[in-house]
Amino acid sequence: LLKRFDLFSVVRDDLNYNGGNMKSWEIWGREDEPANSSWDGWTKLITCNSFKPSGKPVGENTDEDNAYIGKGEKFDFPSGIPEVRYIRIKVLDSWSGQGYVQFSEFTFYKSE
């Protein structure tokens, strides 16, 4: 079972909490291989929101903001989610609100 994941955003002074870095998203999963791109058979596992320590508007970052995003954000899956083999990410919003998404890495961890 999935336990948690880390999101590493694209880290650059002009892109921290900006651009296509994800602000809110959902992670969906399923055990069997999907036959097509339909959402049928997928289960929502978690809804996530990126956290900006200062709460300042887009384009205004503090040293604390930059340090926080540089370490990667950590998220715990809720208990009771089903076992999954396939992951799908549905982006709800980016920090700039533009129609593209960027990230450096997702790292998923399973329960021991």
Report each predicted region and the residues it spans.
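Aromatic, loop-rich ligand-recognition surfaces of beta-strand-rich domains
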Residues: 1-40, 69-112
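Extracellular carbohydrate recognition and processing domains
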Residues: 43-76
